[in-house]
């Protein structure tokens, strides 16, 4: 959890926002997936947001669902994902690693056992996409016991009560939704976030990162101009993987270049 605090302090000193890519672990196969993570980090990723493939992803658009299906086709299991996480952590000791996942994958080993496993492999945060704040007590309590940051989604229409809860229970960062709906680069982000960002700051919430529909450098700049601490991009990155399944090296080069361009947009100095 402390890796996020360290990162945000360093970025503040450098007058930069955070750029955080999302990919599904094991897409398109375990070996290439680890190379993808390396390419994202070489491109300048400040933190990682990683999905564990799940058969029924409610909040995901077709792009991210496709990533999960490719990982399944390659035989990737949650146990294998944890082995990959341990390998990523060993190779990259300082980068914050977040998981974005669904409750069934947490229930399956048992809530406490799941967070204990996260702590063992060096995961810093967990966002459980289908658990609303008001039902989050068992998850966030287990997370805190194991020094894992519980991450909450702040929707664009959040009322004051919800903002206070998110600020009170969340750690690490706050996932600021650009808009309601499923993920995807097609629906470009276009909501004024100043109000939410100001309220979250007033309630001392963890730094907000804007996600959903981030696919171009100007959207990253706009998120930071609105007061967000950075931006998360998922579908646009997974589309690069999808486009180059037959050209693994081109895929890695394109991913690195894409991250470099969006990371460059976080530099405000």
Curated annotation (Swiss-Prot):
This protein's UniProt keywords: Amino-acid biosynthesis, Aromatic amino acid biosynthesis, Lyase, Tryptophan biosynthesis
One Gene Ontology MF term: tryptophan synthase activity
Lineage: Bacteria, Pseudomonadati, Pseudomonadota, Gammaproteobacteria, Enterobacterales
NCBIfam families: trpA
Similarity annotation: Belongs to the TrpA family.
PANTHER family reported in the protein's UniProt record: TRYPTOPHAN SYNTHASE ALPHA CHAIN, CHLOROPLASTIC (PTHR43406:SF1), TRYPTOPHAN SYNTHASE, ALPHA CHAIN (PTHR43406)
GO cellular component annotations of the record: cytosol
Residue ranges the record marks as coiled coil: none
Region forming the signal peptide: none
Entry annotation: catalytic residues: 49 (proton acceptor), 60 (proton acceptor)
Enzyme class: lyase
Oligomeric form and interacting partners: Tetramer of two alpha and two beta chains.
Listed pathway(s): Amino-acid biosynthesis; L-tryptophan biosynthesis; L-tryptophan from chorismate: step 5/5
Transmembrane segments: none
Gene (name only): trpA
Any single Pfam family the record assigns to this protein: Trp_syntA
EC number from the UniProt entry: 4.2.1.20
Role noted for this protein: The alpha subunit is responsible for the aldol cleavage of indoleglycerol phosphate to indole and glyceraldehyde 3-phosphate.
Protein name per the record: Tryptophan synthase alpha chain
Source species: Klebsiella aerogenes (Enterobacter aerogenes)
InterPro entries, per the entry: Aldolase_TIM, RibuloseP-bd_barrel, Trp_synthase_alpha_AS, Trp_synthase_suA
The keyword Lyase belongs to this UniProt entry's keyword annotation: yes
Keyword Lyase among UniProt keywords: yes
Reaction catalysis annotation: (1S,2R)-1-C-(indol-3-yl)glycerol 3-phosphate + L-serine = D-glyceraldehyde 3-phosphate + L-tryptophan + H2O
Highest taxon in the source lineage: Bacteria
